[in-house]
Amino acid sequence: APARGENTDIPGIVVAFAERGVTELRGTAQVLGAGETAASAAIAAQRLGAECVEVYARRPERARALAERLGADVTAHALADWRVGREVALVVDTVPRGYSPEEHLLGDLGDTALLSAAYDPWPTPLAERWLAAEAPVVTGLDMLLHQAVYQVRLFGGAPIDEPVPNEPAVLERMRAALA
């Protein structure tokens, strides 16, 4: 039989945002980084309804390659050009150890949600700013927790969209193990 795989990052990101009250996006999603977690985050943002996704990377050619791979409504930019604007609904930081921009680049965060995928060190520089502004923050561990739930489903032989028996209890035990 041909090999088959599932991406558990995408639904894990979507559910982690939902847990923080972010279930639908209106506006732009910005993804910092151009690796595989960034690709999953961009797709998750599209599934949440982002009107467009902007990918920012230290090497703009990597951002362009990712944007081309993901297709319509994804644009590529240099990380040095990143700014949070009023139209931004969501920022996902996949830069290893977290991105640390100049303070003036952030402006008023309002209700802009952040997923800071790095979990060590915590909080990341961006997460510190978001937490201080009392804006929604999803941690890298939140993402990994929900990704793991989808993996448990698959490892048990169930379809990815079919909860396992007692899944809320499984989730709480997994969460307790992370504490």
Regions found by a protein language model. Name each.
Residues 1-27:
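Glycine/small-residue-rich loop that forms an oxyanion/phosphate-binding "nest" at active or ligand-binding sites
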